[in-house]
Structures are given as C-alpha cells and as structure tokens.
Amino acid sequence: MSANVLLVSHGELAKSMCESLKMLVGDVGKFEYVCLDNDGVDKFRNSFRLKIDNIDNDKEVYVLCDIKGGTPFNEAFKYKLENKADFRILTGMNIPMLLDIYFNLDNLNSEQIILNSKESIEII
C-alpha cells in the first residue's frame, strides 16, 4: 500500500521542503503542502481541510509538521479529532525524514522514520 504525504508549516517551509525534495529525487507527486502565511489561520485551516479531504483515503496518509504544538500541528490535530480521521501526524519534519518516506512509500513504518530522522542529526 502506498502512502500520501501532506507537509504543513509556518511560512514557506513546507513548500521549500517539497521543492528541495524534488531537486533531490525528481517527481514528488504523492507529496503536497499547505503553508501558514500572513493571510492567517482561517485560510490555512480551509486549505488544509481541502487538501486532506481530497487525498486518496484508500492509502495511508501522513501529515508532517514543522513544530509540535504550533498552529499547523494544532489545526491538523484538531481536524483529526473532530473528524475521526485516520492519518498519522509526524512532527519535526526534515529532509532526511522526507527522503526516508519517499524511498519507502510502499512500506512505511512511522516509528522507524522517526528513529532514522533522529539518527541523521549529528555533531561533526
């Protein structure tokens, strides 16, 4: 079973991360994004709901957030609770996490993705 991925963030981070992933791997068709910008929370909420409602629910859905407890996370979590939606929310998104998900779309393991992302952080 393949998965769909929705990135959400403050500012243009989610968009930039999708663009960076595309630069590294090419087609990122199953990755989409919604950004919280200066237009406010209502616009973000509507954009998020539109995206999440139109994602193929026959596949796993992962929502990747920049910050746990931030507005994009809170809106995703609120939607999940209110709609009993079946998607996973992962926080602290980074490029290694996106690459791990991209290369394992057919066999995702949330716990392993988090572990791999943590292991990619080093002091050299």
Regions found by a protein language model. Name each.
Residues 2-64, 68-124:
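N-terminal loops that bind phosphate or other acidic moieties
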